[in-house]
């Protein structure tokens, strides 16, 4: 097997394993002694943690989920200095693949029976590693929308969609990727990566289908609406 392909496969597996770390399960279990899978939407993600336990535990979970989406790309692109892992050729960057692997790990975590969250924070974290301004704007937008509407699901979908739009606009003004030393990333490569990002966003939106139904029925829980009694105090 070509060594480049082997390294890419190894990096994808490692990215998945990092993304699969279930902070949405660990934090409620560690600090409140509860299994988040038995509360709220029973989803293992920062959205459910924020809804069930409030901002004190939801925000750290969200940030850690972001971090695990960014970490694989940061390690491979900037710390290891191994361009052969994210370049198909001299100008084709595939680093978003590792962020996508982390997002899939979050959705289907091997550590908790292939259950997980909806990959909003993890996907945004991957974007931060590529373009911090757009990624951080996505996080800011999430909190603004979520806390103004009191619906985490609305904040998640709006932020995810907005990040994809901002990334596409970035391509048009040719400011999408952070430069990698001594490498020139092609415009075509940017388009390929943006298609991948768009597919991730579509997956995130699809994962919220039950939330859309509850919103239409008026049964979607608001932030802090149904905190667990005697636990959140």
Curated annotation (Swiss-Prot):
Pfam families to which the protein is assigned, alphabetical: G3P_acyltransf
Main location: membrane
Keyword Transferase: yes
Enzyme Commission code: 2.3.1.275
Membrane topology reported for the UniProt record: Multi-pass membrane protein
Name of the top EC class for this enzyme: transferase
Transmembrane segments annotated in the record for this chain: 7-27, 94-114, 127-147, 153-173, 185-205
SMART domains: G3P_acyltransf (SM01207)
Protein location: Cell membrane
Record field: catalytic activity: an acyl phosphate + sn-glycerol 3-phosphate = a 1-acyl-sn-glycero-3-phosphate + phosphate
GO function terms (MF aspect): acyl-phosphate glycerol-3-phosphate acyltransferase activity
Pathway: Lipid metabolism; phospholipid metabolism
Keywords: Cell membrane, Lipid biosynthesis, Lipid metabolism, Membrane, Phospholipid biosynthesis, Phospholipid metabolism, Transferase, Transmembrane, Transmembrane helix
GO term, biological process aspect, one: phospholipid biosynthetic process
Any single GO CC term annotated in Swiss-Prot or TrEMBL for this entry: plasma membrane
Family: Belongs to the PlsY family.
Assembly information from the UniProt record: Probably interacts with PlsX.
NCBIfam families: glycerol-3-phosphate 1-O-acyltransferase PlsY (TIGR00023)
Protein purpose: Catalyzes the transfer of an acyl group from acyl-phosphate (acyl-PO(4)) to glycerol-3-phosphate (G3P) to form lysophosphatidic acid (LPA). This enzyme utilizes acyl-phosphate as fatty acyl donor, but not acyl-CoA or acyl-ACP.
Protein name (record): Glycerol-3-phosphate acyltransferase
Organism, as annotated: Acholeplasma laidlawii
Source taxonomy: Bacteria, Bacillati, Mycoplasmatota, Mollicutes, Acholeplasmatales
Gene: plsY
């Amino acid at each position: 097997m070509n060594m480049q392909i082997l390294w890419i496969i190894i990096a994808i597996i490692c990215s998945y394993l990092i993304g699969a770390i279930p902070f949405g399960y660990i934090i409620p279990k560690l600090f409140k002694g509860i299994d988040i899978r038995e509360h709220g939407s029973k989803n293992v993600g920062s959205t459910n943690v924020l809804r069930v336990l409030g901002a004190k535990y939801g925000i750290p979970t969200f940030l850690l989920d972001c971090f695990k989406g960014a970490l694989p790309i940061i390690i491979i692109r900037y710390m290891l200095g191994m361009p052969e892992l994210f370049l198909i050729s001299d100008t084709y960057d595939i680093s978003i693949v590792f962020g996508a692997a982390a997002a899939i790990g979050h959705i289907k975590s091997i550590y908790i029976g292939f259950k997980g969250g909806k990959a909003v924070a993890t996907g945004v974290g991957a974007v931060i590693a590529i373009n911090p301004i757009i990624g951080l704007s996505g996080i800011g937008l999430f909190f603004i929308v979520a806390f103004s509407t009191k619906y985490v699901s609305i904040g998640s979908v709006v932020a995810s969609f907005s990040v994809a739009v901002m990334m596409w606009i970035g391509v048009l003004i040719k400011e999408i990727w952070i430069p990698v030393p001594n490498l020139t990333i092609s415009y075509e490569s940017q388009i390929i990566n943006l298609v991948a990002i768009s597919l991730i966003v579509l997956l995130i939106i699809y994962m919220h289908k039950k939330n859309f139904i509850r919103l239409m029925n008026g049964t979607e829980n608001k932030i802090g609406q149904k905190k667990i009694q005697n636990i959140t105090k």
